[in-house]
Amino acid sequence: MKLITIVGARPQFIKAAAVSRAFKEFFEIEEIIIHTGQHFDANMSDVFFEELHIPKPHYNLAINSLSHGAMTGRMMESIEAVILKEKPDYVLVYGDTNSTIAGALAAKKLHVKVVHVEAGLRSFNTKMPEEINRILTDRISDVLFCPTNEAVKNLNNEGFQNIDCQIIKNGDVMQDAALYYKDLAKKPS
């Protein structure tokens, strides 16, 4: 199976690293990582990726410092080009950023299945751009990985049990990452 992972914000790299480790340990998945550049930071150099055991992106789109609409639109165009080139079975997105919604929309429009990690989380404040991204990404996803029972409940309250998608309570991927890095920090340098 081939999967594209979309990341753009720093926390998404930490989450993606935890999931990538699980892919390598338990599954035969070819993972292609796209960094949209949403939160570009010169400090996220090779050392950052090496020290935190984060897989380096295969593609860096370098899209940042734009309005929400311009950023999301450019991300969709660039992600679409990679999807067409790589032909994945799934596109995996995390959380609620512009990278999340751009990846989900690009995949869905190309009839590629969308997997959303951290699905069902809600602030119930639709004035927040992140809340709009969460709701829309959940609506178009095929597989929804929820970190909590409350997240599953939110999806059920929104009628997701009547939508053709899979809802899975998987726990908090950030907790998995914290446990991994805690053990790593205990090792002598």
Task: Map each language-model feature to its residues.
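Residues at the starts of beta-strands that form the adenosine-phosphate
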Residues: 2, 30-32, 113, 166
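Active-site donor-nucleotide binding/catalytic segment of nucleotide-sugar enzymes
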Residues: 2-22, 170-189
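Active-site and donor-binding regions of nucleotide-sugar-utilizing enzymes
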Residues: 4-6, 13-22, 48, 60-162
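Structural beta-sheet core signal
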Residues: 5, 33-35, 116, 169
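Cofactor-binding loop segments of dinucleotide-utilizing enzymes, especially the Rossmann-like FAD-
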Residues: 8-9, 36-38, 119, 172
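Acidic-histidine catalytic/liganding microenvironments
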Residues: 26
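Conserved nucleotide-sugar phosphate-binding/catalytic loop shared by glycosyltransferases and other
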Residues: 29-71
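A nucleotide-sugar donor-handling region in carbohydrate enzymes
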Residues: 39, 43, 140-189
